[in-house]
Amino acid sequence: SPPGNWQKADVTFDSNTAFESLVVSPDKKTVENVGVSQVAPDNPERFDGSPCVLGSPGFRSGKHFFEVKYGTQREWAVGLAGKSVKRKGYLRLVPEERIWQKGLWWLG
């Protein structure tokens, strides 16, 4: 655990917001990109242009950390999004779009 007053974020993912190729586990603690579209109702909360899913709780302040297990995936990202983040259409993963993220991409 990190030094100081950092708190581990106990994240629960919201399957109603999940992009079509993201599958949220039944316990809502993990997300997997299966690479193919899943049947999911279109709703205003769902991301339809970028592989994103929202989780809770939200934070307004403090120091929080996440534990990420990415297995054998060559590409992954984890981050924070503002509650009012755009859900429809392509989303650039940059602070100007209310997204702050870290990840690994293979550029080869």
Curated annotation (Swiss-Prot):
PANTHER family: E3 UBIQUITIN-PROTEIN LIGASE TRIM (PTHR24103). It comes from Naja kaouthia (Monocled cobra). This is Thaicobrin. The keyword Secreted applies. It is found in: Secreted. GO terms for cellular component: extracellular region. Belongs to the ohanin/vespryn family. It comes from the Eukaryota. Keywords: Neurotoxin, Secreted, Toxin.
